[in-house]
Amino acid sequence: MSNNELTIVINTFKSEEKIHNCLNSVNIDQKVIVVENSDNENFKKQIEKKYSNVQCILTGENLGYAKGNNLGLSQVKTKYALILNPDASLEEDTLKNFLHSANKIKDFSIIGPAKQDELSFHDKNEDRNEIFEVENLKGFAMFLNLTEFKDIGFFDEG
């Protein structure tokens, strides 16, 4: 995947201890926007100094999951975005696999990973690499086609 096709958005609230594993799992050339739901200037300075690929936005207050992610997504200039929780980390081929799925589907809004450790019909009976439709996704990692996602109006902040 070309690094100019994807931006990673990480919405945080006092996640100083958790976020380093997450950011260390991201390629240094990959653009990352961290939305910190506080006014912690020290956190912003430290994170931007340590990770040259990271832009940190301070909100001044806790906006929550939907509004914080929408703020981060409003700054994205790439075709795709990956919403990632600060306590999640990427495996080596995660971004490549998301892009492969995106190229297969084309008009998707959101793609999410299937977790092998959760019991579900798909985990037990389907090919692990198969793409299938679900009614909902876990919010810890969501790959967005921003053209389609904008059409549905981003995350509901209500």
Feature roles, as predicted:
Residues T12-I28:
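Short, well-formed alpha-helical segments that are part of the catalytic scaffolds
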Residues S25, E36-K44:
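A conserved acidic beta->alpha catalytic loop
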Residues Q30-D39, I57-T59:
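Short beta-strand/loop segment that forms part of the nucleotide-sugar
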Residues L58-V76:
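Glycine-rich, basic loop-to-helix element that forms the pyrophosphate-binding segment
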Residues A81:
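Short aromatic/hydrophobic "clamp" motif used to bind/position activated sugar donors
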Residues E92-D123:
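Conserved donor NDP-sugar-binding/catalytic core segment of glycosyltransferases
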Residues D127-T147, D151:
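A recurrent flexible, glycine/aromatic-enriched loop bordering the glycosyltransferase active site
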Residues K150-G158:
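Donor nucleotide-sugar recognition loop
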